[in-house]
Regions:
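Membrane-interfacial catalytic/cofactor-binding modules of polytopic membrane enzymes
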Residues: 152-220
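Terminal transmembrane helix and immediately flanking juxtamembrane interfaces
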Residues: 1-157, 177-182, 212-244, 250, ...
């Protein structure tokens, strides 16, 4: 099917169209707290939401930059998927085989693609439209921080999706033209560690609980309890779908949860400082001497570990496959183009027992 504005543009349009209906549903018990579209520009000015918008625009450009450098760096850092295969084996394959169903595949694929983008966008928007600037701050900071923390793992610890490594595992997420084109254009397909579908949702839930504890109330009495349940329900679906669709390893959940713990604690602590900057000035956001020294020390330590232990390290062992499939399997992978002036060079080395046939397809000619 020919999508006039492409799969990504179509998804963004659906995201915008769903914002108000879902917000109205979740706030049906307190319509008086809603911000109308006519009043939204004034609400943005009065509550100082300009930096939220700027932050999301910055993250859009930053992600494009990271994805652009992901593939070229793999020549020096390789991949570590074989470590996870040695630990987990074919557990996710058994999950897929036990539940595989065409209707379930369609539902979970649509949910996986759309709902993650929707939660990224909707979380701060929900609180803005509900007149809760503190939680709007926390939701925006949550996405910013958890993605920033994940980037080093995405760039230096490449782990392929399970459908690219477990023989017999079907890439159910990429089963139709829409989702295939969406992920080829927007997903390097080797950013399994950590799972931000899990991490982002879990950190939002943790932030909610830190917030109500500070307020001295029960989560069940919180005015945003239905939104909390909405996030919780989506997290439950993700825990199953990331395995069923042939995307994440079970172990990917652990780093996602670890990122969530760090992100939630930091965001909860720093949000009052960020909110008070309007009275205290931008200088109040700068770290003190102790915090600066600690940050530099951690950055140097992590950078040294990456340069010594990862670059040209265990991940570039040519005898370890970074892509596997069984005899008779047909597997789709994407070759990313990063320059209009330089060709893409791809080397295929068969380290298995059976012959391999490779066919290159230009999507523009299909």
């Amino acid at each position: 099917m020919n999508w006039p504005i492409g799969p990504y543009g179509t998804s963004m349009g659906a995201l915008l169209l769903m914002t108000l209906p879902i917000h109205w549903f979740l706030t049906r018990d307190e319509p008086e707290s809603r911000v109308g579209l006519r009043d939204l520009p004034r609400e943005i000015r009065e509550k100082g939401y300009g930096w939220h918008i700027a932050l999301y625009l910055l993250m859009f450009l930053y992600k494009a930059l990271i994805d652009h450098h992901n593939e070229p760096m793999k020549a020096r850092v390789g991949g570590f998927t074989h470590w996870f295969w040695s630990i987990e084996g074919d557990w996710t394959l058994r999950v897929q085989e036990a539940f595989e169903n065409d209707l379930l595949t369609d539902i979970l694929s649509g949910h996986y693609l759309f709902m993650y983008l929707f939660i990224i966008w909707f979380s701060p928007m929900y609180y803005m439209l509900s007149r809760d600037e503190r939680m709007a701050d926390k939701a925006a900071l949550n996405y910013f921080l958890i993605y920033i923390l994940s980037v080093p793992l995405y760039l230096f610890f490449n782990v392929e999706v399970t459908s690219s490594y477990i023989p017999g595992m079907d890439a159910l997420l990429y089963h139709d033209d829409f989702t295939l084109r969406f992920f080829i254009d927007n997903d390097p397909m080797d950013n399994s560690i950590p799972s931000l579908h899990i991490g982002l949702s879990a950190s939002l839930l943790m932030i909610n609980r830190l917030h109500v504890r500070e307020l001295g109330i029960s989560i069940s009495d919180w005015r945003h309890r239905e939104f909390d349940l909405f996030i919780m329900a989506n997290l439950g679906v993700y825990l199953f779908s990331i395995q069923y669709l042939g995307i994440h390893w079970v172990f990917d959940v652990i780093p996602g949860l670890m990122m969530a713990v760090v992100t939630a604690g930091f965001v909860h602590a720093v949000q009052p400082v960020v909110r008070a900057r309007r009275e205290n000035g931008l200088a109040s956001l700068l770290p003190d001497r102790r915090q600066t020294i600690a940050a530099i020390g951690v950055a140097l330590l992590c950078s040294s570990w990456l340069m010594i232990g990862v670059v040209d390290g265990a991940g570039v062992d040519e005898d370890q496959p970074n892509f596997r499939f069984g005899e008779g399997d047909v597997v789709i992978d994407a070759i990313e183009v990063h320059s209009l002036n330089h060709p893409v060079t791809m080397t295929v080395k068969n380290v298995g027992e059976h012959s391999v046939e490779v066919m290159l397809v230009d999507l523009r000619s299909v």
